[in-house]
C-alpha cells in the first residue's frame, strides 16, 4: 500500500553497534527530518513490558510503539532507528537501510558499551548470520532494502551521501 506524503520515511536498522543512531541523527538533521530513536522512546515513553535482566534492556512492546508513532509516521519526514525491523508496519517506510559492520570492530564497539559477554556474543552471532538483513529482506519490498557497510568513518560519510542523494531523488519523483 503506497501512502502519499510530502516527505519520505526511512528506517535505519542493523545489529547494535553498527552506527544506526549516529547516522540517523545526521541524516535527520541535514534533511530537516525527525529522528526517532526507538530504543530511547521505549524507555522514555514506557513503551515496554519490563526489564530483561539477561540482556540488560527493556522488553519492547511492539503494539505500544506502533500506536505511539502511527500518526507521526503517516505524515512522513522521519528517520527511525532500531535494531529490529520485521515488526514495523511495511507501509511506514520508503527506504530501509541495513548497516553492517566488521565483526572485530563490532565486538570492540559493544565492549566499549559495557555489554555483558552473553549480549556481545548474541549480537555478534546476529551480525555473522545477517539476521537483521534477512529480516529486512523478508519484511519489505526488495527494492527499498539497501545494505550498507558501516565499519569506517569513510563508510559513514559514504552512507550519509547515499541517503541524502536518495532523499533528493525521492523529492524529485514524489513532489
UniProtKB/Swiss-Prot annotation:
GO biological process: maturation of SSU-rRNA; response to oxidative stress
Binding site for ATP: 17, 19-22, 113
Organism of derivation: Dictyostelium discoideum (Social amoeba)
Subcellular compartments: Cytoplasm; Nucleus
Keywords associated with the record: ATP-binding, Cytoplasm, Kinase, Nucleotide-binding, Nucleus, Ribosome biogenesis, rRNA processing, Transferase
Region (LID): 112-122
Name listed for the protein in its UniProt record: Adenylate kinase isoenzyme 6 homolog
A molecular function (GO) term: ATP binding
